[in-house]
């Protein structure tokens, strides 16, 4: 998988007779007589899509997945989207997965899509949401989540291989509940781009397919035919589009073998468990619980939230001005990768919400270089930020003062797409769905499984999700999870004539928010190991002292109007804990041999409690990481292909701590 900080090399395009030509691959993106008609003939008709769509069940649970090997101009996606909305059942959902090693720059994409005015409605939305071209996975949602695009930027084999659970053909088939329904093999000519048509890639494609999965490609070369046949596909040669003599269609019958070199023990995933009903019970009504409830409800699930307090958005999610910003670093780790993916996705989610609700601002935020260590960290990002100025810009003292609206003692890192969101109000919006029921004042002390459903406080559901923050490890089943409580207190002070000029959040040792209702929120204390949210006057003074260091030239009020304390839940590696919950004793038995060789191949999935999931430990960056994590988890529960690479699924897996303990010893 590509490192998030090794930049993508975008497409080098030469326009010839008003057609885009790839200088990297010495080939055209589409011919003068091609474009929409070619896509319709080769991919839509070649996969018999319209007839298949019209026969789909009419419910929200049905997801039809199309995967493509070369995104290019995005025209195949846009045409598929338009036809889906015309021919598919209204409640069915389309998941489109694509990949590009050299994606088009936004300006080139706009120029390409101007050629097809019949796709202008879809093209306008794609252009609006077109991601920052950082390596890895980008997940975009359209039409109220009815159309989703997972766009992977990087090497096609590496990207699709990360969608596999383990890479062993036999075990993969046992574990997989989600498959690609149709493939668009669309890349430059095999003679120009051999990696797009390799045996290794076609083997991965086979492992992501099921019996009856179809393939269509404009190419009819012997290389492609042989690779498809070897991977288990039955080939049919058809007349090609326009002057082209032939094209290929195929359907998946059976895979014969897979390489033993690329197998990965699937300790992060469980064997499939039948769900008789599409009902889910969520313990916890904070941001995590409300986001996962919303994601499941959009998929047609009936959801019940059990919340201990009197309403949602209390506890650690009660901050009325929670700050959204990424943790940017040159250090290449699952943490930085997950933070970047999460920030980009969350930013897209909140921008859409802000079109309809007044619950915050995304006008940027400023991370001040308040000491030498922070300054060095920010300076290390110079080269990367030159390539991706949309994510951040280093600014000097004068620029930081101009951006913030007040006098500041230093420069810093300006993140233009960040800002703040009212978390409690966001929770209310997320659960405003007829499929979501809320039960408040309901303390959960035990969970029970009756061999069919989970039962909590006499309420029964087929799926149970524990999203109750620092209390997530209070149960027998979860007591091995190393969750730590971190208390934080926010102080609210009166705004002054001078302080009201502050336009964006400022972050240093602490942080301060722009005035809202004539007051500023200043925070936050950080008390590790404290699990009770009692208010503390000393923390108010700590926050005020930090505020003075953030902007010493400003006359800040010392009048404390209010204060609030909440408990953050965090893991030892500061990544969230999201996914199926393993049975600790059985897990240690199954994977005991990892102690002698951490990379040993063990042909067993994780022994997990049936249909029991954890969604917790988001720490102080829940606003940033929860949207992506919960969307992935909802897809897993609903039997959909992952929107995250395997490495990141493992990085947030509840089983990672048990595995680490086996390898390193007690």
Curated annotation (Swiss-Prot):
Cofactor(s) this protein requires: FAD
Gene Ontology MF, one: flavin adenine dinucleotide binding
InterPro entries on file: FAD-dep_OxRdtase, FAD/NAD-bd_sf, MnmC-like_methylTransf, SAM-dependent_MTases_sf, tRNA_MAMT_biosynth_bifunc_MnmC, tRNA_MNMC2, tRNA_S-uridine_synth_MnmC_C
Compartmental location: Cytoplasm
Ranges where the record places region tRNA (mnm(5)s(2)U34)-methyltransferase: 1-253
Residue segments, region FAD-dependent cmnm(5)s(2)U34 oxidoreductase: 283-666
Segments traversing the membrane: none
Keywords: Cytoplasm, FAD, Flavoprotein, Methyltransferase, Multifunctional enzyme, Oxidoreductase, S-adenosyl-L-methionine, Transferase, tRNA processing
Annotated Gene Ontology cellular component terms: cytoplasm
Gene3D superfamilies found in the cross-reference section: D-Amino Acid Oxidase, subunit A, domain 2 (3.30.9.10), FAD/NAD(P)-binding domain (3.50.50.60), Vaccinia Virus protein VP39 (3.40.50.150)
Family recorded in the similarity comment: In the N-terminal section; belongs to the methyltransferase superfamily. tRNA (mnm(5)s(2)U34)-methyltransferase family. In the C-terminal section; belongs to the DAO family.
Function according to Swiss-Prot or TrEMBL: Catalyzes the last two steps in the biosynthesis of 5-methylaminomethyl-2-thiouridine (mnm(5)s(2)U) at the wobble position (U34) in tRNA. Catalyzes the FAD-dependent demodification of cmnm(5)s(2)U34 to nm(5)s(2)U34, followed by the transfer of a methyl group from S-adenosyl-L-methionine to nm(5)s(2)U34, to form mnm(5)s(2)U34.
Protein name (record): tRNA 5-methylaminomethyl-2-thiouridine biosynthesis bifunctional protein MnmC
Lineage: Bacteria, Pseudomonadati, Pseudomonadota, Gammaproteobacteria, Legionellales
